């Protein structure tokens, strides 16, 4: 596994940003095999979003995402969003624009990462789950699947506290995506029944699950989990097994790590 840290100036943000790129590579179990000398193709990729109060390191430190990515032969990209909910903010901090275009421009040009939307996925936890839903549903042809782990979903009440951070209404965005008639990304959501966001996520699920069309939808309601990395470490593995893939690395089967 290659883990690459990048610090680059962002034209969307107006200052440098930290990015971590995980690239599958060979292990002691497949040392000196042909594909370790010449890649059979570009890697599929998951853009993995952190939650409120975290940064690009959270998924790397508190889950085994690096090992899971190696096993599934898939690249992972993380970056720091500074509690801005993956939205454009005042004073030029355009995190929506950064994730929507600049980040993929960089990694797809500098690394062996696929630019094929069918090999591009987006997922996140908490605030990052909100970001994954927002970006996946406002760019219907950009991602093959969305993973929303205990997502921060504000109520439709405009005075609700979460709306101060997550300013774009996910209910409105989702209704517009459904009304577009376009193919929707596959959607994976999960929540623990002890999570403080449980009622919000359950309400969103019950509102839109029956209306999801032409795509797969999975909802995991797990007992005895709160808002914690224990559930996210568990469910990211399920998500990696669940997403639809036709790339050459999927055909090679799981890697032994």
Give the ranges of each region predicted by the language model.
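Non-catalytic cap/lid and distal C-terminal segments of serine-dependent acyl enzymes
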Residues: 1-257
């Amino acid at each position: 596994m290659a883990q690459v840290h990048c610090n680059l100036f962002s034209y969307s943000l107006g200052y440098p940003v930290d990015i971590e790129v995980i690239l599958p590579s060979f292990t002691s179990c497949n040392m000196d095999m042909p594909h370790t000398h010449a890649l059979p193709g570009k890697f599929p990729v998951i853009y993995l979003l952190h939650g409120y109060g975290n940064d690009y390191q959270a998924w790397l430190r508190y889950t085994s995402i690096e090992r899971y990515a190696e096993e599934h032969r898939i690249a992972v990209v993380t970056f720091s969003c500074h509690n801005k909910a993956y939205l454009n903010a005042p004073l030029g901090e355009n995190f929506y624009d950064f994730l929507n275009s600049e980040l993929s421009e960089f990694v797809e040009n500098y690394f062996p990462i696929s630019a094929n939307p069918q090999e591009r996925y987006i997922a996140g936890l908490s605030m990052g789950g909100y970001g994954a839903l927002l970006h996946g549903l406002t760019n219907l042809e950009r991602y093959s699947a969305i993973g929303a782990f205990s997502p921060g979903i504000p109520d439709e009440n405009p005075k609700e506290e979460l709306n101060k951070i997550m300013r774009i209404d996910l209910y409105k965005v989702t209704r517009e995506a459904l009304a577009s008639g376009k193919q929707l990304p596959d959607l994976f959501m999960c929540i623990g029944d002890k999570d403080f966001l449980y009622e919000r996520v359950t309400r969103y699920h019950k509102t839109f699950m029956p209306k999801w069309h032409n795509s797969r939808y999975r909802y995991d309601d797990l007992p005895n989990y709160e808002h914690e990395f224990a559930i996210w470490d568990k469910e990211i593995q399920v998500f990696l097994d669940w997403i639809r893939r036709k790339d050459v690395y999927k055909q090679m089967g799981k890697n032994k790590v």
